[in-house]
Amino acid sequence: MRNISMATLALTTVLSTGLFAADDLPGKGITVKPVQSTISEETFQTLLVSKALEKLGYTVDKPSEVDYNVGYTSIANGDATFTAVNWQPLHDDMYQAAGGDAKFYRQGVYVSGAAQGYLIDKKTAERYHITRLDQLKDPKLAKLFDTNGDGKADLTGCNPGWGCDSVINHQIQAYGLGDTVNHNQGNYAALIADTIARYKQGKSVIFFTWTPYWVSDVLVPGRDVVWLQVPFSSLPGKQKGTDTKLPNGANYGFPVNNMRIVANKDWAEKNPAAAKLFAIMKLPLADINAQNLRMHQGEASQQDIERHVNGWINAHQAQFDGWLNAARAAAK
């Protein structure tokens, strides 16, 4: 009788272990295809989501790097699964054009408090009393930021297709700057590197940037550069009519954005564990800034970023495990 009891116990243990493993890995056998933009600094927050999905049993491909509008279309069509870099409201036009809420699952806020705007070097701002972008209607002030000899201010701007590009183009016209300001577009990383080099040479600079990103850790607002305000709120497309004025009365031209995880709606409905994960993950903006600075300082390989992600998980293990437990519970 003792032998039978032990055998029964052993069998029960095996079965329960198997059942636990199945519950533990609700994504087993399912492949996930993440997308992000070509901004390599977005890899950190994307990989953090991928690592969590892998812990749930999903097979997660390396993120595809595409333009934002292509990414949204790919997710809507089911050719990609999710993006962790949906800027809201900056990307509202692209989100709606690709199908909006009918095609996408979007719940929760992954990163909050993302800022954007225009900055100039502090030395020039103080010497010429420049506090607002529309002051560059004055050709004499605009010429201070001329880099190519045409007499216009050369604003280091936003890559085509990022969303901020259309805002900058709109605001240049709205604030009457078409004759005095050039919006320099191309490879932002190369343009901002040139801008920083000019700053270090003591030259006047004007540029657009955003957080989370490393630029504000190199050209520090308040120390090296200052944010410029705008004369009034003016945004294009779906953001038209949005008041960008802050509670303290300052107006930097852009609303504070949240970064959200967007997934294919049909896929999310079939994968409640992943859907729950997408809804509850949260990453502090300051942590992305810190990681992006490490990339700028040379730790920018895929292995480096993987190490950064694993380090973040180790430092926030209880929170990470809590996300996984909630996701597993949603699948039951």
From Swiss-Prot:
GO cellular component: ATP-binding cassette (ABC) transporter complex; periplasmic space
Alphabetical UniProt keywords: Amino-acid transport, Periplasm, Signal, Transport
GO biological process, one term: amino acid transport
Top-rank taxon: Bacteria
Pfam family, one: OpuAC
Keyword Signal among UniProt keywords: yes
SUPFAM superfamilies: Periplasmic binding protein-like II
Disruption phenotype: Uptake of glycine betaine and choline is completely abolished in the ousA-ousB double mutant.
Stored CDD domains: PBP2_EcProx_like
NCBIfam families: PRK11119.1
Binding partners and assembly: The complex is composed of two ATP-binding proteins (OusV), two transmembrane proteins (OusW) and a solute-binding protein (OusX).
Name this protein carries in UniProt: Glycine betaine-binding periplasmic protein OusX
Biological source species: Dickeya dadantii (strain 3937) (Erwinia chrysanthemi (strain 3937))
